[in-house]
């Protein structure tokens, strides 16, 4: 089939095949990046929830240790 096409048309067809191949790879890369972004967002949400719980626990511990504000040590810059 290629032998019947003029040289210009064969070059055009080769370029079209190259572009279709690149597009296919770009679509695959986009899907992989999309999945990675979704995973990163999920990890970030989990970490934010974990930090929230840890801060709550820290507040409870501080309340127990320093029930009176006078018992609390001064900030480090004093």
Curated annotation (Swiss-Prot):
Pfam family, one: SlyX
NCBIfam families for this protein: PRK00846.1
Protein name per UniProt: Protein SlyX homolog
Family: Belongs to the SlyX family.
Organism name: Xanthomonas euvesicatoria pv. vesicatoria (strain 85-10) (Xanthomonas campestris pv. vesicatoria)
Top-level taxon: Bacteria
InterPro entries: SlyX
